[in-house]
Amino acid sequence: MAPKTVWGYFFIDYIPEPLQVSDKQRVVELKGEVARLFEDCNCKDVVERMNLVDVVQRLGIDHHFKEQIDTALKNIQGAEFNSSDLHEVSLRFRLLRQHGLWVPADQFDKFRRQEDGSFSSDIADDPKGLLGLYNAASLLIHGEEVLEEALLFARRHLESIRRGGGLHDSPYLSEQVGRSLKIPLPRTLKRLEAVSYIPEYSSADDTTYIHPEILELARLDFNLLQHVHQNELRTVTQWWKGLCDVIGPDYGRDRIVECYFWAFSMYYEEEHARARMILARLIMLASLLDDTFDDRATLQECRELNKAIERWDESDDISLLPECIQKFFLEVIRNFAEFEDELEAHEKYRVAYARKAYQLLSKSYLQEVEWCHQGYTPSFDDHVSVSTASAGIQVLCVGMLVGMGDAATKEVFEWMIGSNNRVVRACAEVTRFMDDMADFKRGKNKTDVATTVECYMKEQNVTGEVAFDKIGSFVEDAWKTLNQAALVGDRALLPVVQRVAGLAMSMMVFFHGKIDRYTDSEHLKETLEDLFVNHVPLC
């Protein structure tokens, strides 16, 4: 049995600090001032432009300046750049790749020894440069051995510098190094980075690139957006309470705040409120479906429920199911109908795609239950095929599109639900492998189905330690695929690919350190408090 929720109905009773009209007015003024900084920066050197883009992104206000950032990056990509500073070269590489703009790995050849191609010891005592290299190299794609070497080199020397006390005089750099060694910056959710970076930016040792108007905007914008998220959490928690009144408070795991966080990880901007609210509820319904197959239903009841979900008819005879599962099924049907009601007439077709994804999820859950009851350990490839489907990522990725604006076209839905979608599969692999590593480390599995770690051990006849490391390498391979999709895929799909990557980033939050923070949600509470409860001080 999963631990109880750490949130309960907290957000129903929570009263956010009231917004000041003057704060909203000030944000408008500050946006104009920062936009002018971008205009002024066009006349300055490449390094100043790069630093401005980086600061705006890390402070979490880049959603206000998409056009300015696009223009700046095109200028950065096209401008002559001959720097031999490791931090500057790494920063340019990272910024361009983060935005799907190609830059080759040979940019780092100047920091390698001609004799054997290894990285030069001359950069081994440059923590700022090494940190930049480490974060840049985490955007590697398949076949980039030089960036594999860069990651190992930078990590080894950063850890050595930390152990030797080389960062004692730079506490904020030390904090950034610590964060990146846990989760590299390009795999970190923007809002989480903003929580840490806002105080770091305000107290930076190097004041060259500190702009008071940017800092003030970041603080105000964070709090104003947090107020939006708090109101949404109140609404979605009320929805959850109503659902529990029907199906029972103990039907499944109470993780509505965590489900909202998953939706938030894909889009936190105010203009995506409708999409976020639909997705949060859909994720909760997927979580309850998982709990139903795992804990509520017998094998035969799982089969009957899957048939009912395939038929998707509330008038269907479901009398063979227990009353609680009947109620759950009818609530699923009702909620999907509500999703449709919340869409415009020309958008209503979208819910059919979400329904299809939910049906496929049910089918994968049933397959795992069948294996469990047979005591069957599938081949590693068969397990990955089914367990990446049961990770629920396709439901989340299709569901992400349901409430979005005009960018969510029918063609994008077809692409998202396609069986050969390597982006969705890579995100599912990150999820499945990290989840299974957490399960394996704690010595228990939520169900009795073997994990991918155990399947690999049996098939390859290796120890748990060897299998564990191998599964970890598969996580890295999946990230390479996600990075590659942003660089060489259809540019029109880049915004969607980046949001799927945001979902993969959320898995780093849920499972880093091989801890399952969805099941053991008390480990996630402090992070969610920083995002949804604690205000950023305005001074």
Curated annotation (Swiss-Prot):
One example of the protein's molecular function in GO is:
alpha-copaene synthase activity
Location of this chain's protein in the cell: Cytoplasm
Enzyme class, broadest EC rank: lyase
Which cofactors, by name?
A: Mg(2+); Mn(2+)
Q: List where the motif DDXXD motif lies.
A: 290-294
Write down the EC number: 4.2.3.133, 4.2.3.77, 4.2.3.57, 4.2.3.-
Q: Name one Pfam family in it.
A: Terpene_synth_C
The UniProt record gives the binding positions of Mg(2+) 2 as D290, D294
Q: Name the cystine pairs.
A: none
**Quaternary context:** Monomer.
Q: What family is this protein classified in?
A: Belongs to the terpene synthase family.
Name the UniProt record assigns to this protein: Alpha-copaene synthase
Q: Which organism is it from?
A: Zea mays (Maize)
